[in-house]
Amino acid sequence: MAGALFSLSVGGVMFATAVVIIIFSAMLYDSIVKRRSKNINPPEFTGSHQLASCNCSGGTVLLYLDFDGVLHRRMNETFERMPLLEKILKQCPELHIVVSSSWRETMTLEGLKYLFPVAFRHRIIGVTPSLQEVKDTEYVRYRECLLHARHMGVNKFIIIDDESHRFPPGCENLVSTNYSEGMTDQTVASVIMKYCQYLT
């Protein structure tokens, strides 16, 4: 009798443990899905090529920011280079970020903001339009950034990206990174230098 009761007790504990594991797994999966949830029309756009207005002052400099190969090495999604971006933002108070990364195609603007430190989220002001469906895709990333900048009435902008082939040769706006390294101290210095040149 005691043995039977012991077996039932052990069985109950195992069942309860299994239930807890299932619930935890479901919660983890749900958080991942929400993090990269599909959003075809981000808040900034009413269509794939239409842009909303933004209150940009004459001193505003836009920073078009890629993620993979920039904020982290390759596509490991750790955002390990975020402290380097923080250095830039602290020294460049009129610099505002527009996300040009392909992450903008699968996340809302609010979702993208939550990837950044709280102190700088208000400086994430939008995303670039997607021109991937256009037949002529030469220098497509540059054209997306340029379209956004022109719509905003801003001619001072910097781009950080690891895919230089998406930009015209000698593009003065581009600060290129190595896909395997991401941002470095040299990237920080180059961005700050370009920012200071715009304001002088």
Task: For each feature predicted by the language model, list its residue ranges.
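Intrinsically disordered, low-complexity, compositionally biased regions/tails
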Residues: 7, 15-16, 51, 130, ...
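Non-catalytic pre-domain segments flanking phosphatase-related domains
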Residues: 10-11, 18-65
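Short, strongly hydrophobic alpha-helical membrane anchors
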Residues: 1-7
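Alpha-helical substrate-recognition element adjacent to the catalytic core
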Residues: 51, 57-135
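C-terminal cap/substrate-recognition subdomain and adjoining C-terminal extension
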Residues: 114-200
